[in-house]
Amino acid sequence: MTVFLSFAFLAAILTHIGCSNQRRSPENGGRRYNRIQHGQCAYTFILPEHDGNCRESTTDQYNTNALQRDAPHVEQDFSSQKLQHLEHVMENYTQWLQKIENYIVENMKSEMAQIQQNAVQNHTATMLEIGTSLLSQTAEQTRKLTDVETQVLNQTSRLEIQLLENSLSTYKLEKQLLQQTNEILKIHEKNSLLEHKILEMEGKHKEELDTLKEEKENLQGLVTRQTYIIQELKKQLNRATTNNSVLQKQQLELMDTVHNLVNLCTKEGVLLKGGKKEEVKPFRDCADVYQAGFNKSGIYTIYINNMPEPKKVFCNMDLNGGGWTVIQHREDGSLDFQRGWKEYKMGFGNPSGEYWLGNEFIFAITSQRQYTLRTELMDWEGNRAYSQYDRFHIGNEKQNYRLYLKGHSGTAGKQSSLILHGADFSTKDADNDNCMCKCALMLTGGWWFDACGPSNLNGMFYTAGQNHGKLNGIKWHYFKGPSYSLRSTTMMIRPLDF
């Protein structure tokens, strides 16, 4: 309200001043403008212009508002005194206006400060509200971002772990793949080498097959010729056998006649010149037969001391001076040597082929005088060898026909394949060896086994091509090794003093 009155009073004063000191401006349409500059603010007041003389009546003068009545009175003449008076009044108005201006400035300053403060407060409150809202939203967004970040970190951790596992798995797979690749390369190299060798072998095999075909054709021709020759030889052999049988029969008859004569001479005696009797002795072995003038190899009858009947034996009259009595012979596998104690005691087989003389007869012969043993051996390649012992005899049945030997020599090995220090005879039903394994059952046949030992001439007979790797074959260790089965063997004895 105070501001309004101040403005009204100011307007009245400016109106009066304008009428007294200013002229009407035709461009302003009867209006005048007054501008007041305060700091950066400028105030412009529009004052109205009255028509006619500006001089007012006394009544009008005194009918103005209270502010106008308080102003000093102005004389109505236009004399110089009044002009001076007006100037004085003008100065007073100027001072008054200055006071009003100061008043307005002070009031406006406080009001503007109040308004500005209110505006600042309102703005601050708004800003605080907005800031609070922003803080709330920021906190919420921060929380959400934190949750998202946590999820992202967890997912990232899982992905990193999975990636690490995948990397390890990939590394292992790469390592395995590299190893397999290397192995494949090695196998490929080996295959290439094997293919090359196979090709070479195929070439050699083809050449060998061609050679074998040629040899086969040649052999077939040779076999054909040999078959014809063999047939002719068989015919001749049959004829010779027939003749030989007749001769053997005649020889046997002759031998019987001789034996009868010997027996007759033994009983009655033969008168010699001078009236003395000469005693005729029977053949104790093949040495006696040889010394009696029979120098052809064959079957002869001998009379062994302490034996009830004579025994037919095969005498070898050709080898190393002759006079050999054969006690064992193997040549074709036609006779089974896997027999029991009694059969080995009394002997079996045919003296003209494969046979065993008999332990009882061997004991009886070697008990008559001192004998030498010779073993003749032949392998499947046609190689021959022998072992000879200067002293040979065996014990009786109570002694298990124990073997006694001395003085080894020969070409069938530097060492003896027979046990020199002695060994008992064993068969499949009489185990007398020094082994828990029963050598006669394992190695077959009857023999002087000593913990099986390095020899067995009564073992299983194996044909050519099947005679290798046979521990139970006909073996003589120091001639062909422990698993080579021989082709033929002959054991024969002769008196030491022959």
From Swiss-Prot:
One of its GO terms (biological process) is Tie signaling pathway. The gene is ANGPT1. Homooligomer. Interacts with TEK/TIE2. Interacts with SVEP1/polydom. Interacts with THBD; this interaction significantly inhibits the generation of activated PC and TAFIa/CPB2 by the thrombin/thrombomodulin complex. One of its GO terms (molecular function) is receptor tyrosine kinase binding. The keyword Transmembrane does not apply. Residues 158-254 form a coiled coil. NCBIfam families: GGGWT_bact. Residues 277-497 form the Fibrinogen C-terminal domain. It is found in: Secreted. Glycans are attached at residues 92, 122, 154, 243, 295. This is Angiopoietin-1. GO terms for cellular component: collagen-containing extracellular matrix; extracellular space. SUPFAM superfamilies: Fibrinogen C-terminal domain-like. Binds and activates TIE2 receptor by inducing its tyrosine phosphorylation. Implicated in endothelial developmental processes later and distinct from that of VEGF. Appears to play a crucial role in mediating reciprocal interactions between the endothelium and surrounding matrix and mesenchyme. Mediates blood vessel maturation/stability. It may play an important role in the heart early development. The keyword Signal applies. SMART domains: FBG (SM00186). Keywords: Angiogenesis, Coiled coil, Developmental protein, Differentiation, Disulfide bond, Glycoprotein, Secreted, Signal. Disulfide bonds join 286-315, 439-452. InterPro entries: FIB_ANG-like (IPR037579), Fibrinogen-like_C (IPR036056), Fibrinogen_a/b/g_C_1 (IPR014716), Fibrinogen_a/b/g_C_dom (IPR002181), Fibrinogen_CS (IPR020837).
